[in-house]
Regions:
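Anionic-ligand binding patches
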Residues: 2-6, 13-192
Length: 192
């Protein structure tokens, strides 16, 4: 029987992404129970990821994996950063706010960053990794795939937005995939 690994999130889209990215790992992925509420009040992506994984693992008595990620824009001194998901009330308004704040700004350099943390059933941190993806913020959205800031984030090497990429292409560049790639060998050992 496969060991259970909780994904510390209530987002059904996230478990689908994790299923694909963690396909080499012999585990059964489940979303955290709806009854668990974790307040993300850390001062870094790493603190938030560790807190989510630790709380979910202790409350479920199972391993839990969590990530915290966001968009950091050079001209905005790293904003929205750890507040990326709370920068406005929905994706459309978040994009609108970014574009308004960057209006007339020539420096459009940005990067997505993700911290991924795994905690054991006692809430102890076992694995932690960071991944990043460099790009630029466009003047207007482009593409129909993805979510969040994907339509305005143009990846540096392909010159495509994440919203113009299919999931397989996005996975090869994504900050979350890069962070998970760093810990997959250890995850395989834990969930043998």
């Amino acid at each position: 029987m496969k060991k259970i690994l909780y994904v510390a999130s209530k987002n059904p889209g996230k478990i689908n992404e994790y299923k694909k990215l963690l396909s080499p790992v012999n585990c059964r992925l489940l979303l955290q129970p709806n009854s668990i509420e974790v307040i993300e009040n850390g001062m870094s992506f790493s603190e938030n990821a560790i807190k989510k994984a630790s709380e979910v693992s202790k409350l479920t008595n199972n391993y839990a994996i969590a990530d915290d990620s966001g968009l950091c824009i050079e001209a905005l001194n790293g904003r929205p950063g750890i507040y990326s998901s709370r920068y406005a009330d929905n994706d459309e308004n978040r994009i609108e706010r970014i574009l308004k704040e960057l209006k007339g700004e020539e420096n459009r350099k940005a990067f997505f960053i993700a911290n991924v943390s795994l905690c054991d059933p006692y809430g102890k941190l076992v694995l932690d990794a960071e991944g990043a993806c460099n790009g630029n913020i466009l003047n207007k959205p482009r593409g129909n795939n993805g979510f969040g800031y994907d339509p305005i984030f143009e990846e540096t090497t392909t010159r495509l937005t994440f919203a113009e990429m299919n999931q397989e292409e996005k996975d090869s560049f994504s900050h979350r995939a890069r962070a998970l790639d760093k810990i997959i060998p250890e995850l395989i050992k834990i969930f043998y």
